[in-house]
Amino acid sequence: MTGVRVAGVGLTHFGRHPERTGRDLFAEAALAAREESAVPPDDIEAVNYGNFMGALSERQGHQAPLMAEMAGLQCPATRYEDACASAGVAIREAVKAVRSGEADVVLAGGCERMTNLSTAAVTEGLATAADELYEIRAGMTFPGAYALMARAYFEQFGGSREDLAHVAVKNHDNALPNEYAQFHRAITVDEVLEAPMVSDPVGLLDACPVTDGASAIVLVSDEYAEAN
């Protein structure tokens, strides 16, 4: 097996982009990754695209070939759907393809466009990643699921809402120097604790936001990198 190197990365700003389509967002990230990598488009042998909500938020199935086309590529393109891990799985499979020698160059990444939907529609859409028979029919939402997990953790290991609040504070602090982050505002533990409750003990500032954005990465084999 060969080693795998990162040749280029690209990101969009994450936030509300109601005027843009998912394929437009992914094209921005993919073109940025291509530019940083300096890999000729004809050398890219596959596009691995991760997406969960596209069929719901944009009524668009069979997305991967459209994403490849928008990125200026003509090669096999595959969509990976694994809920919140969709783009991560797309990248993992790209690494496996390069390591195994199946390909020398793969562009991988993902995109979600969600802010064109109402909060209720996004919540319902995200809930489809849960078990339809035993969770969705019982009214389970993902904030509710994580609230149950947090309560179980507190019961077994100890902990409190204040401990969770420090995680939110840390996350906002990490976003401050990141130009692509959705929020650029420091928050305090008190603000987290005083925010509206979503599903006890998960409050508004504990929960992940709805957002639009895309990212992409160009992976190459050691042999390709050394030859180019």
Model-derived segments and spans:
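Condensing-enzyme catalytic core mediating Claisen C-C bond formation in acyl metabolism
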Residues: 1-23, 32, 132, 166, ...
